[in-house]
Amino acid sequence: MFNYGNANEAQKEAISATDGLVLITAGPGTGKTFTLVKRAVYLIQECGIKPEQIMMATFTEKAAKELITRITNELAERNISVNVNEMYIGTFHSLCLRIIKENLEFTRLKRNYRLLDTFDQKYLVFRNFHKFKNIEGIDELLSKGGSWKRSDEICTYINHLSEEMVDIEALQSDDNPGIRTLGRVLSVYQEMLEEGNLIDFSTIQTECYKLLMQNKQILEELQDKLQYLMIDEYQDTNYIQEQIVFLLGAKHHNICVVGDDDQGLYRFRGATIRNILEFPHKFENEGCKIIPLVVNYRSNSDIVDFYNEWISTTSGHKFKFSWDRYRYQKKIEPHVKSDIQSPAVVKLFSKDDEDEWHEKILGFIKELKESGKLTDYNQLAFLFSSVKHQRVTALANFLERNGINVYSPRSDMFFKRDEIKLALGCLMLMFPKYVMKLEKQEFDFLQVEHYRYYRECIVAANEYVTRADNKELLQFIRKHGKAHAGLTGTTDYAYSGLLYKLFMFRPFSDILDTDMSVGVVDIRPTRNLALLTQIIGKFEYLHRVDVFNGSYIDRNTELLFNLYLKLLYDGGISEYEDEAEYA
C-alpha cells in the first residue's frame, strides 16, 4: 500500500492518476509541489518506472532543485535506492540543452560552444550593431536612441520570433516591408550565432525542436524512453514548449500538466493561456482527467476569502470582455479557518516624510519581535511593486543600519555594496592613466552618474589603503600602478589575475574566509566577490584579453570600465539567492 502521507483526497487522485492526459488545476498554496513529488515517487515505487523514463519540466532552476531534493529525500525515507539524477528534471531550457548536448553532433553546434545569457546576447548585438544598422527599414523598426537601447529592442524581436518558431524565409518574402526587415534582422543574428558557435536562451528550444524534427531516430529513442511527462506551471508555457511536450509524449500519451489559469503572468514572454485551456482536447478520441486542487495550506481564511472574491469577478466596467469562459471555475478553500485576531497584512505609510516612514516601520518590527509574534525576522515579508525602487532600497539600507538584515537579492544592489566599491576602486587605482582621464572627465560614453560612482569607488579605496595598517596593500597597488603606467612589454596576468592577487589582502581575505554555513546575508559579500571575478573573467573571454600588453592595456581598461561594467551597472545585477536547502 502506497503511503500518501498527509495528502488530501484530490491530491491522492492526482498522485495515482498516472496514465493518459491529466490536468491538475492547482490554485495558490494547494500543494502542487508536494503532489508532483509524491507522483514521481508513486511512478517509481508502485508502477516500476525507472527514473530515466520520467521527465519533469519546471519554470525555474530553483524549483527544479527543490523537486530533485524532495524526491531524493522521499525515496530515501522509503529505502528506495535509485539515481534521481537520471530523471529529466529541469526548466524547459535546461532539458532542451541536455538533449542538445547528448546529440551535439547532429546540431549546428560544435564542441566548446558558448551559451549566451541575457546580457551576453545584448552585448553581442551591441558590439555588432553595424551589421544591423544598414538593414533596409531598420530605422522604422526601432525607436530613436543609442545603440545599446536599440540593441535591446533587436534582442526583444529576436527572442519573440525564435520562441514562436517563425520561418525566416517566410518573413523575408512577406509583402509587408516591416516584416521583411524583421526577417533580415533575424537572419543576420543567426549568422552571428553560427559564426561564433553560440547559442542563446531563446534559440535553445528552437535548436532542440529542429534536432528532434530532423532526426527521426533521436526522436523515436526519446519517445520510447520518456514514458511519463510532468509539466509544472503549464499556464506559463509558450508555443514552442507546447510543441516539444507533445512531440516527446506522442507515443505514450502519458502527459500530466499542472497549472493555474488564473496565474498566467508571462504573456510578455510569449506564454499563452490557450495551452492550459485547450490541453484536454489535444489527443482526439482520448479523454483527459481534470483534477482540481483547491485546499489552500499557505494563507489564512481572510486572505483566501479576499482572493476568491477578487478572482471570481470576471465582468463589469473594468473588463473589456467577460473572461469567465476563459478559465476553469474553482473556489479555493482554507485548510483551517483562521482564529487569528491580528490582521495578516498591514499597510504602513506616512504622507511625505521618508524618515518618519522608516522609523514607523522599524518601530513596528521591533514591537512584533518584543511581543513574541515574531521569533525570527525572516517571518516578515515586505511587498512592493518593485524592489529596485530608490525608496525601497533606502528602506533596506535603513533597516540594515539598525541591525535588521534584509534579504532582497533582486534589488540590484550589487554595485552599491561596500566590498564591490572597494574592489573596483582598488582595481582602478592600479591603472593611473585611466584614473587621470576619469578625473578630467575625458570619456564621452560615461554620464554624470557613472563618473560619480567611479569616484565613490576610488575615494573608498584611497581611504582604506592609506590607513596605517594597510601598508602592504598600498605598496601592492602602487607597484602595479607604476608597472601598468609604463608598460612596454607583456605581463603574465590580466584583470582577473590582478583581482585574485588583490583578494590576498584584507578586507577581501577576511570576507573570503567567511564560514559558508552562516546566514545568507553574512555570506553575501563572499558571494558578491565571487560574482565579480566571474564578471571580469567573462569580459576577458569576450574581448580575448589573456595578458596585459603595452599597446592595448589603456584601450582594454577603458573598454572594461567605460563600456562593459558601465552597461552592467545600468542594467543592474541580482545578488546571490539562497538555495542551500536544495540539491
Feature annotation, model-predicted:
Residues 23-24, 30-36, 51, 285-289, ...:
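Helicase P-loop NTPase motor core
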Residues 1-25, 30, 34-41, 53-55, ...:
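Accessory N-terminal region flanking or inserted into the helicase ATPase core
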Residues 179, 373, 471-583:
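Accessory C-terminal helicase-associated subdomains
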Residues 17-18, 83-86, 105-199, 226, ...:
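ATP-hydrolysis module of ASCE/P-loop NTPase motor domains
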Residues 1-109, 115, 216-220, 250:
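P-loop NTPase Walker
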Residues 2-6, 12, 42-45, 127, ...:
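Conserved RecA-like helicase ATPase core segment
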Residues 88-98, 230-233, 258, 563-583:
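Conserved helicase core region in the C-terminal RecA-like lobe
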Residues 99, 342-348, 363, 394-395, ...:
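Conserved short internal alpha-helix adjacent to the catalytic or cofactor-binding core
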